[in-house]
Amino acid sequence: MTDKQVYPVSPEVAERALVNKSQYEEMYRQSVEDPNTFWGEHGKRIDWIKPFTKVKNSTYDYNNLSIKWFEDGVLNASANCLDRHLEQRGDQTAIIFEGDDPSVSRNVTYRELYEETCKFANVLKDQGVKKGDVVTIYMPMIVETAVAMLACARIGAIHSVVFGGFSPEALAARIVNGKSRFVITADEGLRGGRAIPLKKNVDSALKHEDDAKVDKVIVVSRTGNDQVPWTEGRDLRYEDLMKNASAECQPEPMNAEDPLFMLYTSGSTGAPKGVLHTTGGYMVYASMTHQYVFDYHDGDVYWCTADFGWVTGHSYILYGPLANGAITLLFEGVPNYPDSSRMGQVVDKHKVNILYTAPTAIRALMAQGESCMDGTTRGSLKLLGSVGEPINPEAWEWYHRVIGNSKCPIVDTWWQTETGGILISPLPGAVDLKPGSATLPFFGVQPALVDNEGNILEGKTEGNLVILDSWPGQMRTIYGDHERFVQTYFSTYKGMYFTGDGARRDEDGYYWITGRVDDVLNVSGHRLGTAEVESALVAHDKVAEAAVVGYPHDIKGQGIYVYVTLVQGEEPSDELKKELVQWVRKEIGPIASPDVIQWAPGLPKTRSGKIMRRILRKIAANEHDQLGDTSTLADPGVVDELISSRAFK
């Protein structure tokens, strides 16, 4: 194996792993050669009210697009997360809640979660929620959010979770697009020691948008703030409604292809895009990927640091883990509050075995230095995961060495809101690891690299990442706009699902995600992935974070414009700029030499931590009057600072 450092599967990991290398190869072969047999068998991993007899019925034919899995089966997602476990593990912890305040935590058993879910399902029915209705959930990371999602699933309502950091405008757009008449929120959320005015934002959203026809707003008391505005007749207190609700509620029988939830992806421009996931295939896929990718064994304590407002929170805090009877940790706070040792403290406090987090969080801790883990042992950890964007090798190595004590394999998972679950990732007992590579496809997933004309490229190469055939967790449509679904994902390369990402494949068949295709630079006719240049910059010991975009260049077509955030204590200078240019030349080659370096106090990020390169491209091109939708920015002030300090006016 090449491509720099390789971490072979250790004997200890291999011994306890669910799948070894030869098993992975055989299972993968069957999954693509005979998907009906493979998924027919693995579809039985969840409980069916009426078993399916049909497995896969899908075609990527552009004129006849159809994606259906287990289509004659009947099931209920909440029953698969709760009821099926009551006999064997009713008294086992289902959710460990860790509050924003480190002194606040509690364990919720499967039986308690079942009873709360049934009660709230009855509350929703009493308020007029019916099967097929869209319920908007705008909540903090608390147990009641999990209850709300599961209660919707129990009665066949479609939940639409909107991240609690989104603005009233963004919330309003999602309520209107989903034709949602019911909103569940909290008086306030707590995050990093600050109160987030959720109820106030809901009120603003409903005033802001004339088309928002909301009948009921159910409000959970999180902070007990009695100053929140109240609209009699519309607003209802969660606690009052739950007092007399019955703890028995029969799960609604759902066809496998009935919708389970929708989740809006920001899309760089245009109307919100409501990604719709259905019940059967999604549950099979979320549960199976959770078990195999994280090598989950009974009793493991599993912590995914995502938010319910993102697909990672849906698939890998809630549905996947609970379907598997797992112990899942629900974290209200942020990794650096009250200080940067919090992540290590939570791991030690709850004896976390599996940690799944984002490169953004890892790089933020890296910038603080290794001392951020002082006073914590993290000795319980046996597996680490990464999600959200490609992880640069330097962050991978730091994560492995500092957080994982050099003993935990890292599963670098590549997937999307649209895919429902992980598509490319190592299985820890089967695949040797290369820092920065998502490695190999999961069962049933057939990735390919194509050129701009759609020709499939073989062997060691680089191109546009497509998937050649359907898998059970795949989205079925964009809510209310099937034509946009077909156009967005299936029109670029006919007969293939286009991911929008670029990738390279090395001589071992490993996939390396190079970033969104619009994040590929064409410098003097050479293709350069921005992730590659960013990786090189972040490898420099004075650089905390870097973002790379193209800008119009008279000679090269595109020049390389770099935004650099320095490590605490380092000072910007012209000498350091020259040093960084030489560093990149050394790491990648002269073709990758940055043309412009701008010092950045921070980078514009969405609330899920993704860098908004679209905005950085506009600033670099001096088009800051055309920034487009900035409602998803975590800190809009960063943009103003970058515009005022732009490297050339």
From Swiss-Prot:
Cofactors required: Mg(2+)
Alphabetized SUPFAM superfamilies for the sequence: Acetyl-CoA synthetase-like
Binding site for Mg(2+): 538, 540, 543
GO cellular component annotations of the record: cytosol
Keyword Metal-binding attributed: yes
Protein's organism: Marinobacter nauticus (strain ATCC 700491 / DSM 11845 / VT8)
Binding positions (ATP): 388-390, 412-417, 501, 516, 527
Magnesium in keyword set: yes
HAMAP family, A to Z: Ac_CoA_synth
Keywords tagged on the record: Acetylation, ATP-binding, Ligase, Magnesium, Metal-binding, Nucleotide-binding
Family: Belongs to the ATP-dependent AMP-binding enzyme family.
PANTHER family for the chain: ACETYL-COENZYME A SYNTHETASE
Reactions this protein catalyses: acetate + ATP + CoA = acetyl-CoA + AMP + diphosphate
Binding site for CoA: 191-194, 312, 336, 524, 585
Residues with N6-acetyllysine modification: 610
Gene name in the database record: acsA
Name of the protein this chain belongs to: Acetyl-coenzyme A synthetase
InterPro entries tied to this protein: Ac_CoA_lig (IPR011904), ACAS_N (IPR032387), AMP-bd_C (IPR025110), AMP-bd_C_sf (IPR045851), AMP-binding_CS (IPR020845), AMP-dep_synth/lig_dom (IPR000873), ANL_N_sf (IPR042099)
GO biological process terms, semicolon-separated: acetyl-CoA biosynthetic process from acetate
GO molecular function, one term: acetate-CoA ligase activity
Described function: Catalyzes the conversion of acetate into acetyl-CoA (AcCoA), an essential intermediate at the junction of anabolic and catabolic pathways. AcsA undergoes a two-step reaction. In the first half reaction, AcsA combines acetate with ATP to form acetyl-adenylate (AcAMP) intermediate. In the second half reaction, it can then transfer the acetyl group from AcAMP to the sulfhydryl group of CoA, forming the product AcCoA.
Domain of life: Bacteria
PROSITE patterns (UniProt xref): AMP_BINDING (PS00455)
Processing and modification events after translation: Acetylated. Deacetylation by the SIR2-homolog deacetylase activates the enzyme.
Organism ancestry: Bacteria, Pseudomonadati, Pseudomonadota, Gammaproteobacteria, Pseudomonadales
EC number(s) stated in the UniProt entry for this protein: 6.2.1.1
